[in-house]
């Protein structure tokens, strides 16, 4: 039966969900301890890696995974993967591109609004008993009419751009 090695420690409901999602005829092994040593040990008979967390999938791990056929990342980042070593072995890698793009874009906009509205300063002063604008000296601004430069127009960048345009900002 093909083995899917999940490279993180899941317990409780997340583990139940993962096991229910496992295709018939496969079995999922999660790491009891998410350590490099256990990953190397369990990689020996793994057919597939389901990569969560930050354990590196490097040349050493791959050397201990002779029957590895595919790597699936549960998120979008691949910084823990030695892409060059994986390519040399001809192992396909899949990611969940865009899976969290909306959430990250909303968080990005929330941080922008927090900065431009000076929410941390206003919150601190309000909790200190100072709440009148004249007493605080706090000046806030708005996004409307501002020019915002975005670096990268991938899944997240495009959503942030649409949100900023809805606020009346010019995006470059």
Set out the residue ranges of the language-model regions.
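N-terminal glycine-/charge-rich "phosphate-binding" loop or analogous flexible N-terminal tail
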Residues: 1-46
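Structural detector of well-ordered beta-strand residues that form the stable sheet scaffold
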Residues: 5, 70-72, 92-94, 149, ...
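Rossmann-like dinucleotide/phosphate-binding beta-alpha-beta segment
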Residues: 137-172
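Short phosphate-binding/catalytic loops that engage adenosine nucleotides
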Residues: 26, 91, 169
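Short gly/ser/thr-rich secondary-structure transition/capping motifs
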Residues: 28-34, 51-53, 128-136
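Phosphate-coordination loops involved in phosphoryl transfer and adenosine-cofactor binding
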Residues: 1, 68, 144-147
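Phosphate/diphosphate ligand-binding glycine-rich loop within oxidoreductases
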Residues: 47-127, 140-141
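Short secondary-structure boundary/capping segments
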Residues: 19-20, 40-41, 84-85, 139-141, ...
């Amino acid at each position: 039966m093909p083995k899917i090695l999940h490279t993180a420690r899941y317990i409780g409901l997340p583990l139940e969900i993962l096991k229910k999602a496992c295709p018939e005829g496969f079995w999922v092994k999660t790491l009891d301890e998410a350590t490099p040593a256990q990953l190397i040990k369990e990689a020996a008979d793994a057919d597939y890696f389901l990569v969560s967390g930050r354990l590196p999938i490097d040349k050493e791990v791959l050397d201990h995974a002779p029957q590895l056929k595919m790597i699936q990342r549960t998120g979008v980042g691949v910084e823990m993967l030695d892409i060059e070593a994986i390519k040399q072995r001809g192992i396909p890698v899949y990611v969940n591109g865009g899976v969290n793009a909306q959430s990250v874009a909303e968080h990005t906009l929330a941080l922008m609004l927090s900065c431009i509205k000076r929410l941390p300063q206003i919150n601190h002063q309000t909790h200190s008993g100072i709440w009148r604008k004249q007493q605080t000296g706090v000046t806030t601004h708005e996004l409307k009419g501002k020019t915002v430069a975005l670096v990268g127009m991938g899944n997240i960048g495009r959503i942030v751009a649409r949100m900023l345009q809805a606020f009346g900002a010019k995006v470059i």
